[in-house]
Amino acid sequence: FNVEKGDKVAVIGDNSLATTAFHQILNGELDATTGDFEFGQTITTAYLPNENEEFFDGTESLMDWLRQYSENKDEMFIRGFLGKMLFSGEEVLKKSDVLSGGEKVRCMLSRMMMASANVLMLDEPTNHLDLETIEALNNSMKTFTGTLMFTSRDHTFTETVANRIVELTPKGFIDSLKSFDEYIVDGGIADQKKALS
């Protein structure tokens, strides 16, 4: 299937390992057993993995943690990106090895925003996040002008952000230009799912 600029694709499926593998393949972390894919020449990507522990094995502050991923080392620049994910004041001096799961996701999202990519791939971005952060993420993804491919078990997030649903099944996939709620109640989709199970 082709993904166009501005598509906000919810990648869904009964098997969360399959949706995670899909994101890992697109991000080059896993080799596909069949098939291939190709990004356009002007595409820049950023990826939020489902698991992020490997990114937080040091004792540096959040400022220093994010600074390592930036060409611009200026404190105000780094603080700005942490601030977008609701880190403020002395919070940016917190050690990265004592962060909660939600704080780690917020750091990873700050890192993604700093990359200024035009294609974002998010694997379960709302995991561990509090309601305020989910709302901030939801609003930023709704207004994001690039392409988004994401997996989320958060119904509201998926319904309000996605303009396209791709469901992975044991025997293929279903690609539908519908909202999540429209997709769920579509009888034709249910028939396709049964045929591909």
Describe each model-derived feature in a short phrase.
Residues 1-197:
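ABC ATP-binding cassette signature C-motif
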